[in-house]
């Protein structure tokens, strides 16, 4: 009887550990500290609350989602563990903010992209480096990497100190049109559809603005999804970086005639 009780207690402990482990992330793991040197963290200035992720694309510019915009934003570069006191040299402010079509009138299928010019350039280091813009459009079927400090539980919100990373699949745009009829997505759009149709892996609240990296290239910006996160047959939507390349590159080059593209 004693042996049976011991075995029963061990089984209970194993089941308890398995349940806790499955709740640690929405299908991902903690990112390696050397894996995300281009990932930036956006905070609301007055409340000091974490808002979104973003991507450093050169020493002076960051790409994120338009819906992450606030009147007063702090941007931190070279961050891994958010519980560690930030160095003042990691902190930047927006000098200029640009929105596609010059207006913050994004939708679930268009214009959810914001280009931020930092108040001063960053110095590259082991943990601070840019992610290159794509040289070609992404290929459906690609395995893509997502990362961020977004919630690791859904629908409850639990924000981790260290960013989490996961692999998802780039899907045909029609998959998202079928999966999200409530969004009334148009036949064509400047967005990407990505996720795991079996469920269990997904970006979620406050991962917004972070990168979707396919075959080593910065192809998407975390934009919209359904809640709770990581449901089967509910992939998420990502702003397509490649379709905004001309706009991005011309603004960075200082052209004033392309700030409001049609």
From Swiss-Prot:
Distribution of this protein across tissues and organs: Expressed by the venom gland.
Positions annotated with a glycan in the UniProt record: 105
Alphabetical list of CDD domains matching this protein: Tryp_SPc (cd00190)
Cell compartments where the protein resides: Secreted
Active site, UniProt feature: 67 (charge relay system), 112 (charge relay system), 208 (charge relay system)
Biological-process GO terms, alphabetical: proteolysis
Disulfide bonds: 31-165, 52-68, 102-260, 144-214, 176-193, 204-229
UniProt main location, coarse: secreted
Signal peptide (UniProt feature, chain positions): 1-18
GO cellular component, one term: extracellular region
Keywords associated with the record: Blood coagulation cascade activating toxin, Disulfide bond, Glycoprotein, Hemostasis impairing toxin, Hydrolase, Ion channel impairing toxin, Potassium channel impairing toxin, Protease, Secreted, Serine protease, Signal, Toxin, Voltage-gated potassium channel impairing toxin
Record-annotated Peptidase S1 domain positions: 25-253
GO molecular function: potassium channel regulator activity; serine-type endopeptidase activity; toxin activity
Family annotation (SUPFAM superfamilies): Trypsin-like serine proteases
Entry EC no(s): 3.4.21.-
Residue span(s) of the pro-peptide: 19-262
Oligomer status and interactors: Monomer.
Cited function: Thrombin-like snake venom serine protease. Displays a specificity similar to trypsin. Releases only fibrinopeptide A in the conversion of fibrinogen to fibrin. Reversibly increases the permeability of the blood brain barrier (BBB) in mice. Induces the barrel rotation syndrome in mice, which is manifested by gyroxin-like, rapid rolling motions. This syndrome may be due to its effect on BBB permeability, and certainly also to other actions affecting endogenous substrates present in the endothelium, nervous tissues or blood.
Note: Negative results: does not have phospholipase activity, does not aggregate platelet, and does not affect the release of the neurotransmitters dopamine and acetylcholine in the nervous system.
Family membership: Belongs to the peptidase S1 family. Snake venom subfamily.
Designated name of the protein: Thrombin-like enzyme gyroxin B1.3
